[in-house]
């Protein structure tokens, strides 16, 4: 998929009424905490793979310094349940998250462009 410039964090989407984009980054407190965090993130993806919620995209990267970057796109309307945050696995991910990580930098993002193929 390729897309042009968007100057807002929420814009109309063909897949849903509004497309929210959020980027979060945080450092892990230790390599062990990063490993635990990764296992919990993998469980979120396993649940999303089982439940297959529509109108949502989610990408998590573990960087070489054991920090994490989460990028999410949600096509739900304001006031509707976030399909990622409403999973049991995400609740488990959130449990103790403050002890596993440092300060979170979380920002709404504007999509400038995207080219997507199969990611492994």
State where each predicted segment sits.
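Short beta-strand-to-loop capping motifs
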Residues: 25-30, 72-76
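A short local loop/turn or secondary-structure capping micro-motif enriched for an aromatic residue
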Residues: 31, 77-80, 115
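Onset of an N-terminal alpha helix
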Residues: 17, 38-41
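An amphipathic, aromatic/His-enriched active-site/gating alpha helix that lines ligand/cofactor pockets
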Residues: 43, 47-56, 73-108
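Short, surface-exposed ligand-recognition loops at beta-strand->loop->(often short) alpha-helix junctions
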Residues: 27-39
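Glycine-rich beta-strand-turn "strand-cap" elements at beta-sheet edges
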Residues: 1-20, 27-28, 56-67, 90-120
């Amino acid at each position: 998929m390729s897309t042009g410039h968007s100057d807002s964090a929420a814009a109309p989407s063909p897949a849903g009424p509004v497309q929210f984009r959020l980027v979060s980054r945080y450092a892990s407190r230790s390599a062990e905490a990063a490993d635990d965090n990764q296992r919990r993130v993998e469980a979120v993806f396993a649940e999303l793979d089982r439940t297959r919620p529509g109108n949502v995209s989610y990408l998590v990267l573990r960087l070489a310094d054991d920090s994490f970057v989460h990028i999410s796109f949600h096509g739900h309307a304001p006031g509707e349940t976030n399909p990622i945050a409403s999973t049991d696995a995400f609740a488990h991910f959130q449990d103790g998250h403050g002890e596993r990580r440092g300060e979170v930098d979380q920002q709404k993002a504007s999509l400038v462009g995207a080219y997507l193929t199969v990611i492994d």
